[in-house]
Structure formats: C-alpha cells, structure tokens
Swiss-Prot record:
Family: Belongs to the DEAD box helicase family. DDX6/DHH1 subfamily.
Span of domain Helicase ATP-binding: 165-335
EC code(s) of this entry: 3.6.4.13
Catalytic activity: ATP + H2O = ADP + phosphate + H(+)
SUPFAM superfamilies with a match to the protein in the record: P-loop containing nucleoside triphosphate hydrolases
Main location: cytoplasm
Any Gene Ontology CC annotation: P-body
Matches recorded under CDD domains: DEADc_DDX6, SF2_C_DEAD
Name under which the protein is recorded: DEAD-box ATP-dependent RNA helicase 8
Biased composition (Basic residues): 54-64
Keywords in alphabetical order: ATP-binding, Cytoplasm, Helicase, Hydrolase, mRNA processing, mRNA transport, Nucleotide-binding, RNA-binding, Translation regulation, Transport
A biological process from GO: P-body assembly
Annotated positions binding ATP: A178, K179, N180, G181, T182, G183, K184, T185
C-alpha cells in the first residue's frame, strides 16, 4: 500500500507535503517556465532562481528534487508575504493543505472546527458500550475520514467496530456475527473508505445487500462518512432505470452499493468493470446466501481478482454460510459477538388475542404506549394494506410499504418515515433487514412470524445502537406453538403483557 495514502495532504508523508511526489501539478518543465516568468515580475525573490540544467545526466534526479524543493519553499514564502508576515523569516518545507468545506484538515485543532451533531444523551446498553476503550484515531485513518466519522455523530467505536476495523485494514477476510443495531454498517464502511485510492478511477469496493431500501441506506452512510473525501459512491438496485445506471458507470465510481442481480447484470454487459475491485462486502450475508441470491453472488465473485478480500456480516449464520465460507474464505478472521441473540435493551411481551380482536388490541396499545415511531409487521401484502387503512380510520397517522409497490413509491415512503413524517409504518418482512431508524422504539408483530430468524430481525428494528425498545406480539391460538419454539431457539423470554407497561423500559 502506498504510504502516502495513509495521510491527508499536508500531513506527514501525505501527497500535499512531500516534495518528492512528482505526479503532482503540471509537468516539471512547465513549472520551470512558469517559475521563470514569475521571477521577472518579482525581483525580490531572486534568491530562489533555479540552477541551469547540468550536462551530466547522473545529476538529473538530484536536480529535479532540488527544483521541486525550491518550488515548495518559494510557494510558502509568497503565501506568508500575502498574509503580512516577516519576509525574512525562514520558510517551512511543508505546505498547508486547502480547507475542506471551510475546515483546514491539516490544522492541529481540526476537531474543534467540526460541525458536530447534538450529543445523544439516551441510555445505551452494553451491546454497544462494552468496548475496549479504543478511539477512532487509534486506527491511523485518513484525517478527512475521521472528520466525516465525528460529524456523523460517532464518538468511539462500538464492539463490532473495534473488532473488525483493524482486521479489515490488514486485508484479511472476515466472517463477523453481531446483533442487529450494534454498528455493523460503519464497521465495514470505514475500512472500505480508508482503503480506496481516490486517484484511481475504478470500482475498488462492492457492497452487496439483499434489499433496495438497505442499499439506499448503506450508500447514504458511505456518502456521509466520506463527505470530506473525493470518493464517488453509486447505488444500483433492481426496479430502477438500467439506462441511468449505465450512464452513471461511464463516470468515475469508486464504491458500488447494490443488490446482487442488478450488479451482475451490469457486469455481464461489460459496463461494470470489477477487475480492480479488491474488496467485496456482504451485508446480511445469510440472506444473500439464500437460494434467491446465492447463484448471483457466486457468479459475481468470478469477475473479481483472485486477491480480493471478502467481508461477511450478519446476525445469523445458517449452514449455507459455512459451505460458502469453506469455498471462498479459506482462512477468515472470525468475529462472534453473539453471547445471546436478542438485543439487551429490547423488552418482549405477548398478548393472547382472537383474530377478530387484533385491531381493537392495536388501538389499545396505541393509546397506552409512549410511541416515538413504531413498525407493525404483517405476514402478507393484502393484510398490510387492509391494516394500514384500519389504522388511518382509527385516527392515527400511518404509512405502509411492501414488495409489490413501485420502487419510486417505496423510496418515498422509506424516506418520509425515516424523516419523521409519520409515526407508524405497516409492512411485510421486506423491512426487517438492516433498516436503521433510530427513532423507532416500538415493534408490534400484528401477525406472529413463522421462524426464529424472522422474529429476530423484526424485533431488531427497535432498540437501535444500544437504545431501549419494546416488542409486542399479538398471539392467536394457532401461534402458541410457534411462540414456545422461538423462545427455545433464541434462548430468550417473551413475557405476558402486563396491564401497565413502565415507560422506563423502552423510552429512557
């Protein structure tokens, strides 16, 4: 790895401060000509007149170095004179880097200049606070990347970030298992952004996700973390215009986020070139290795170079993941932070109801609970639309989303709900994977899920990043066996709902 890429311009051996970095700016001869023109208009700088070229070619390299050094010295001298400083003072060899969005990234007090969001004072569980005490600076990240991390509101790494960031930076394959809502997205986005060479116009990182909404969310996180870097992020998913994606890929793209089918389609057409892609990240890896996606994922890997690095992240790892790991990740670094499956901050209740009483029960929950935002899960598209209509008739604001909606409509609903335009969202399991909306503190399973895996991902939509949350399950007579089985599989306790629920367990 080029050591200059470890520092931002103007710091250490960074491109901005290294006089030996010959590829910077116009060719040397042009610089020399420009320098001579400036000498005629600025006679008081004659002490920096460059020596005439010597005839002995073994001095060429030394002379190039000297000319570059003089250019740097003279540039600093002019800058100081413009600022009204003493002309006779000794110029420094290191140039200051340009300010990024009004922030001088080379300044020693760069942290004080950041526009930090308000501090989140809510209670957090040990799912995200039980760390080793590391700081983001300990990983020697680019200064501009650190600026984006802090401006995103991150204070210090969560446990999954502490484990995965340094290992990913070494180039090792990773198989990481951590709970929903503990910071997995940043755990792979940060090393991906750090390893991208901004000067190289090629796709260097591909992030695969199973749903379109998760692709949009992940690309947004990458853009926010890398906003001070010159890294081009692109998102591509099925259901959107293929023509627009093709046009976009003719422009520079460093990091590509998308669903496997669409990226494979663009790759087969020869539009998406992956020969320089050194890192493949699989978020929600267990879903990506389901029969629906696995053939596309395996075909896509064939287009990557043999030296590629694969990072796999998920909360659950079934047998299919082990088979894939044995084939494509011979010696991965394994991270397992799953001492238990459900988040510590989520309190789970069930209520026995008859099918015809469910809407009435939901109305009672709305009136008694202190809801910031809630997600209500149904098992079918038809039931989603019917329930959303019922909730609206009861006088509560409500959106709904499911897989049969047009992609533009889905995007709009997702965006509006995330921005707080509505308090309640009714949806199918489309919305269970990776969707991170911090304001959601209540999840209601209007229809109880059939599998423990689905249940785990549903309730994980509340209590994000160590905050408190509440999951309420409406259980019919037919669901009682499922309830018992899921409790056993997850090793968790789902309690009967009490007459009054203490707000402190989900609103602190």
């Amino acid at each position: 790895m080029d050591p200059r890429a470890r520092y931002p311009p103007g710091i250490g051996n960074g491109r901005g401060g290294n006089p030996n970095y010959y590829n910077r700016g116009p060719p040397l001869q042009q610089q020399h000509n420009h320098h001579q023109q400036q000498q005629t208009s600025a006679p008081h700088h004659q002490q920096y007149v460059q020596r005439q070229p010597q005839q002995h070619h073994h001095h060429n390299h030394h002379q190039q170095h000297q000319q570059q050094q003089q250019q740097w010295l003279r540039r600093n001298q002019i800058a100081r004179e413009a600022a009204g400083t003493d002309r006779n003072s000794e110029p420094k060899a290191v140039a200051q880097s340009p300010a990024v969005d009004g922030i001088d990234s080379s300044s020693q007090d760069w942290k004080a200049q950041l526009k930090l969001p308000p501090q989140d004072t809510r209670y957090r569980t040990e799912d995200v606070t039980a760390t080793k005490g590391n700081e983001f600076e300990d990983y020697f990240l680019k200064r501009e990347l650190l600026m984006g991390i802090y401006e995103k509101g991150f204070e210090r790494p969560s446990p999954i970030q502490e484990e995965s960031i340094p290992i990913a930076l070494t180039g090792s394959d990773i198989l990481a298992r951590a709970k929903n809502g503990t910071g997995k997205t940043a755990a792979f986005c940060i090393p991906a952004l750090e390893k991208i060479d901004q000067e190289k116009n090629a796709i260097q990182v591909v992030i695969l996700v199973p749903t379109r909404e998760l692709a949009l969310q992940t690309s947004q996180v990458c853009k926010e973390l890398g906003k001070h870097l010159k890294i081009q992020v692109m998102v591509t998913t099925g259901g959107t215009s293929l023509k627009d994606d093709i046009i976009r890929l003719y422009q520079p793209v460093h990091l590509l986020v998308g669903t496997p089918g669409r990226i494979l389609d663009l790759t087969k057409k020869g539009i998406c070139i992956l020969k320089d892609c050194s890192m493949l990240i699989m978020d929600e890896a267990d879903k990506l290795l389901s029969p629906e996606f696995q053939p596309s994922v395996e075909q896509l890997i064939r287009y990557l170079p043999a030296s590629r690095q694969i990072l796999m992240f998920s909360a659950t790892f079934p047998v299919t993941v082990k088979e894939f790991k044995d084939k494509y990740l011979p010696k991965p670094y394994v991270i397992n932070l799953m001492d238990e499956l459900t988040l510590k901050g989520i309190t789970q209740f069930y209520a026995f109801v008859e099918e015809r009483q469910k809407v009435h029960c939901l109305n009672t929950l709305f009136s008694k609970l202190q809801i910031n935002q809630s997600i209500i899960f149904c098992n079918s598209v038809n039931r989603v639309e019917l329930l959303a209509k019922k909730i609206t008739e009861l006088g509560y604001s409500c959106f709904y989303i499911h897989a049969k909606m047009l992609q533009d409509h889905r995007n709009r609903v997702f965006h509006d709900f995330r921005n707080g335009a509505c308090r309640n969202l009714v949806c199918t399991d489309l919305f269970t994977r990776g969707i991170d909306i911090q304001a959601v503190n209540v999840v209601i399973n209007f229809d109880f899920p059939k599998t423990a895996e689905t249940y785990l991902h549903r309730v994980g939509r509340s209590g994000r990043f160590g905050h408190l949350g509440l999951a309420v399950n409406l259980i019919t007579y037919e669901d009682r066996f499922n309830l018992y089985r899921i409790e056993q599989e997850l090793g968790t306790e789902i309690k009967p709902i009490p007459p009054q629920i203490d707000q402190a367990i989900y609103c602190q």
